[in-house]
Design a protein with these regions (language model features):
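Amphipathic, Lys/Arg-enriched alpha-helical "gate/interface" segment within cytosolic domains
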Residues: 2-176
Length: 176
């Protein structure tokens, strides 16, 4: 019996309307829902994680010529990345910016840590050459309400906030 033809990861990424978990290891998860990339960071980003993010981003943007959006959930207490990783993240952001409608960071928690992380994220994107909309919020519901507007404006793909929230929560609930 012949094995079925191998599936193209890019085709899988393009066809998915349910939440697809693509990577889940070492405190870093990558998932997709429609043409939205969903990321969960529960530990400090490492060069290896950024390489995985870059690899995935390349395939995902190729699978979605209409454009994509990205939501990054950063768990309470996840350490700020060091300089090497900050530079790598900036490079990835710059490399894929022309394909991105919007980026939303959900920074869980409050206080000094959350303020420091928000400042880091603002600086990361402020210094990059970006044409996408950027939003930083403190909860998943706020992200699910904000993303559909800039996403539809750029990609012409309509997202239902309640469905988007469910997809984000699926990824977030992987760890607790």
């Amino acid at each position: 019996m012949l094995d079925p033809a191998p599936r193209s990861p890019a085709k899988d990424l393009a066809d998915s309307t349910s939440t697809q978990l693509l990577h889940d290891a070492d405190g870093f998860s990558i998932a997709t829902w429609k043409n939205v990339a969903l990321h969960l960071w529960t530990v400090a980003a490492t060069p290896e994680m950024v390489a995985k993010l870059d690899e995935f981003s390349l395939a995902f943007t190729r699978a979605h010529p209409e454009g994509i959006s990205a939501i990054h959930v950063i768990a309470k207490g996840a350490p700020l990345p060091g300089k090497e990783v900050r530079d790598l993240l900036r490079d990835v952001s710059d490399r894929h910016a022309k394909h991105v409608a919007c980026v939303c960071h959900v920074v869980e928690g409050s206080g000094f840590w959350a303020s420091a992380l928000q400042s880091f994220l603002t600086g990361l994107h402020w210094l990059s050459q970006r044409s996408y909309s950027l939003h930083i919020c403190s909860d998943i519901a706020a992200a699910a309400q904000w993303v559909p507007g800039p996403h539809a404006q750029r990609t012409k793909v309509t997202l239902a906030p309640a469905e988007l929230e469910q997809a984000i929560r699926f990824v977030r609930n992987r760890v607790d």
